């Protein structure tokens, strides 16, 4: 019997002359396109791949890397990865979607440093999402060259690359083309394996932790589903199958990912995330004036904008997305697609709706959609929607490249060229004005202080970038004109190359890197600020308006000298012990601000309240109540009742001062008095001078008990792990064991092996009642939501596997 395996090459055949066996179903043209996409990713990530540098900006060094180190510490202590003790009196670990605990790549953090790990994640996800865009374009009937261009425009687009420093959004965005492509295939073929593939893709996107990206994928998938609808009453049976197929894929995706979203939903239900005010949800909306950045490479956020301009355009902050640039040269191809094909016009209509949503508070659209679909109220920052616009723009560019191959539509092509000339002319005018009249242009929206350089220093580089983009777009327009002649199909290839190079040049260096040693550096202040005897540390946050920030004679976090490299600012923040980075070195923090909107409401109120009472005796009381033994700050005002420990130099204009808090309560202590109050009355009780957290506990219900003259007993910690605490209590009379840790109903407490009620104590912490005598109190974190989620995911996986095997896939 002859073998089906390919014959081995003759001995001695050089490697480069041997035929490479491609995977089944993969044509050589596809392999060439994927190879070219890999080359583009290499160019984008060259500093990381060739120089060993790492990404560091924004959420990466402030949240991702500390959280990754916290996860490693929790696992190393033999605990289940359910509770993170290092953030704000402790918080759920698995339930926090930004931890991405169920996303498979996350567990590689156990094998390497988080910054090295994330560099690999970026490279892998950029290539992965480029392949997904290629597959999606092919699903949408684009040719292989057109699909390659679509994938290249997507992976080099400003919005997608801007998400690199917003890690969970980046991972979620990488899955958007795959979710849309697999849903399109499932709806078209209605086969079990295609439904399973769509469900798995959706589940993996959900566990990346970005609800925003999941919502965007759902919107695009729903829009794509419309092309499979057969309109008319006689086609209702076919459309019924479409609905059934989509529902099965959605249910499978939700079932497989239930271990993530059920605990996350339980966590969010106790927070203020569902009650965000309109001003928070629509913060960082795309200003209509900044939409010009989508087709003209003007980095407005990096310019020295006047206070008025920055307030209007970026909420007086840095832009949420560093680049909105989608490509001026690609725009010529987008115009060609819209003018020449009906399918492209349908995609363009969805693109227009998406951009309208990105405008957020500047139009009623975002408010209308979130009102009609209440679950979407959990989403915030409409500018994120621009990543969906980038994908649609890329698909249109691919369609436009295909349109250039048609030579029978001269009138339409001339219409495209006329529109392109207008757009290119406007961009060229902006570039020329920036180069020749920087003072007049800069005076309109830039600021210049006495020692600042002239406006030309900021605007001339912008002019160069804009005029270079104009040159690329002009070349694409010329290629479109030449394509009208028969036999010039090569013009589409030339146009595609110019469109890709335009985006590569414009977004080059968008995500800055630094040597890995900067992220590994351990500031000397860490060991001094670490609280003794299991106490907590309170690190001051100067990004929020407080009395402490107002006491500084300069802007918050102002560097002492101009930085030689942007990464110096990150090093300075870490050296000054910015609150969120404490977890990287295993320092347990306290009173952190609720940046994600996922803290329990009571804890968020308590943390804000600490800032409100600065400079009063209540401030010290709250520090003592939270077992805070050390305070790290760069100011002195309001800390007269604290004891100075050390003063350390920083890269900022102020040194870092470490203070000791007098007489903080132990992490676990016994009290006899009970004060009963809830809500505003509880906050008032905390501030009452008669309430001493070392002798009494504040409970939301029950019977009040007068504070005894001395503690009703003693306690000793026997075992302390992140998810399990064992305490021995020797009680002379009944009392309460108070834990200076966040209350969460997932903590299961037993006294001598018998279940005991866990109380929310001191407004946001927790306590358990203990009778007289010697007792062992065991508190273990095992939330019901995690068990339920794991059970649903397990059942879904079993059902999915059974369907897969039954179909003989």
What is each residue range found by the language model?
Residues 1-46, 242-250, 335, 481-497, ...:
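Start-transfer (signal-anchor) and selected internal transmembrane alpha helices
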Residues 15-92, 265-272, 332, 518, ...:
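Hydrophobic alpha-helical membrane-insertion signals
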Residues 37, 130-140, 144-229, 245-264:
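Membrane-embedded helix bundles of polyisoprenyl
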Residues 38-131, 152-174, 280-326, 360-373, ...:
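Membrane-interface coil-to-helix junctions
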Residues 64, 332, 356, 626, ...:
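Active-site-proximal, structured, solvent-exposed surfaces of multi-pass membrane proteins
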Residues 64-75, 79-81, 253-337, 378, ...:
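Periplasmic/ER-lumenal interhelical loops and adjacent helix-loop junctions
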Residues 166-174, 182, 186-199, 203, ...:
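Contiguous transmembrane helix-bundle modules in multi-pass membrane proteins
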Residues 276, 282, 448, 497, ...:
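Extracytoplasmic
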């Amino acid at each position: 019997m002859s073998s089906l395996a390919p014959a081995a090459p003759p001995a001695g055949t050089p490697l480069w002359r041997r035929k490479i066996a491609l995977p089944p179903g993969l044509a050589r043209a596809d392999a060439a396109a994927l190879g070219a996409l890999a080359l583009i990713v290499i160019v984008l990530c060259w500093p990381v791949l060739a120089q060993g540098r790492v990404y560091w900006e924004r959420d990466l060094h402030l949240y991702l890397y500390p959280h990754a180190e916290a996860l490693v510490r929790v696992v190393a202590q033999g605990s289940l990865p359910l509770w993170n003790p290092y953030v704000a009196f402790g918080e759920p670990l698995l339930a926090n979607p930004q931890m991405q605990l169920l996303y498979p790549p996350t567990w590689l953090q156990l094998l390497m440093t988080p910054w090295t790990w994330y560099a690999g994640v970026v490279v892998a996800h950029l290539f992965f999402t480029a392949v997904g865009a290629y597959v999606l374009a092919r699903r949408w009937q684009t040719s292989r060259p057109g699909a390659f261009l679509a994938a290249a425009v997507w992976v080099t687009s400003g919005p997608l690359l801007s998400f690199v420093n917003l890690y969970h959004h980046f991972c979620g965005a990488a899955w958007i083309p795959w979710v849309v492509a697999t849903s399109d295939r499932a709806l078209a073929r209605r086969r079990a394996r295609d439904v399973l593939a769509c469900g798995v893709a959706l589940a993996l996107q959900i566990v990346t932790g970005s609800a925003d990206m999941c919502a965007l994928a759902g919107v695009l998938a729903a829009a794509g589903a419309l092309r499979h609808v057969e309109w008319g009453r006689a086609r209702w049976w076919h459309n019924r199958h479409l609905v059934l197929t989509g529902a099965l894929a959605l249910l499978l995706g939700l079932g497989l990912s239930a271990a993530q979203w059920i605990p996350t939903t339980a966590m969010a239900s106790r927070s203020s995330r569902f009650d965000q005010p309109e001003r928070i949800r629509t913060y960082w909306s795309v200003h209509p004036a900044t939409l010009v950045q989508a087709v003209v490479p003007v980095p407005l956020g990096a310019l020295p904008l006047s206070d008025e301009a920055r307030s209007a355009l970026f909420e007086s902050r840095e832009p949420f997305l560093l680049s909105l640039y989608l490509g001026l040269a690609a725009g010529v191809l987008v115009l060609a697609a819209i003018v020449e094909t009906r399918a492209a016009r349908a995609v363009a209509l969805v693109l227009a709706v998406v951009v309208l949503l990105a405008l957020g508070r500047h139009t009623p659209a975002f408010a209308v959609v979130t009102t009609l679909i209440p679950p979407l109220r959990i989403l915030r920052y409409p500018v994120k929607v621009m990543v969906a616009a980038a994908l649609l723009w890329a698909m249109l560019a691919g369609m436009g490249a295909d349109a250039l191959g048609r030579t029978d539509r001269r009138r339409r092509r001339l219409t495209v060229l006329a529109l392109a000339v207008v757009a290119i002319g406007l961009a060229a005018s902006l570039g020329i004005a920036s180069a020749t009249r920087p003072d007049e242009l800069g005076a309109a929206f830039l600021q210049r202080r006495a020692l600042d350089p002239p406006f030309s220093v900021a605007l001339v580089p912008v002019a160069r970038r804009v005029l270079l983009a104009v040159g690329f777009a002009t070349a694409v327009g010329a290629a479109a004109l030449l394509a009208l002649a028969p036999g010039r199909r090569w013009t589409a290839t030339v146009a595609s190359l110019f469109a890709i190079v335009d985006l590569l040049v414009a977004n080059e260096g968008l995500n800055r890197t630094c040597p890995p040693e900067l992220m590994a550096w351990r500031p000397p202040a860490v060991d001094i600020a670490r609280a003794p005897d299991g106490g907590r540390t309170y690190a001051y946050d100067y990004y929020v308006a407080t009395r402490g920030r107002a006491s500084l004679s300069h802007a918050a976090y102002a560097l002492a000298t101009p930085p030689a490299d942007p990464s110096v600012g990150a090093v300075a923040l870490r050296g000054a012990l910015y609150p969120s980075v404490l977890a990287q070195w295993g320092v347990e923090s306290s009173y952190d601000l609720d940046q994600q909107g996922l803290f329990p409401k009571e804890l968020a109120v308590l943390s804000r309240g600490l800032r409100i009472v600065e400079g009063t005796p209540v401030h010290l009381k709250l520090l003592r109540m939270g077992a805070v033994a050390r305070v790290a700050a760069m100011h002195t005002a309001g800390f007269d009742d604290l004891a100075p420990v050390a003063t350390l130099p920083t890269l900022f204009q102020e040194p870092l001062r470490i203070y000791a808090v007098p007489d903080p309560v132990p992490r676990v202590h016994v009290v006899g008095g009970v004060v009963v109050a809830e809500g505003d009355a509880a906050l008032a009780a905390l501030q009452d001078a008669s309430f001493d957290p070392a002798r009494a506990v504040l409970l939301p219900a029950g019977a009040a008990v007068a504070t005894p003259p001395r503690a009703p007993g003693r306690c000793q910690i026997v075992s302390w792990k992140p998810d399990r605490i064992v305490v021995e209590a020797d009680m002379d009379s009944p009392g309460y064991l108070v834990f200076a840790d966040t209350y969460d109903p997932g903590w299961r407490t037993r006294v001598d092996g018998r279940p005991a009620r866990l109380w929310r104590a001191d407004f946001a912490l927790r306590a358990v009642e203990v009778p007289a005598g010697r007792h062992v109190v065991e508190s273990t974190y095992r939330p019901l939501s995690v068990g339920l989620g794991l059970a649903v995911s397990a059942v879904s996986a079993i059902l999915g596997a059974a369907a897969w095997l039954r179909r003989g896939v």
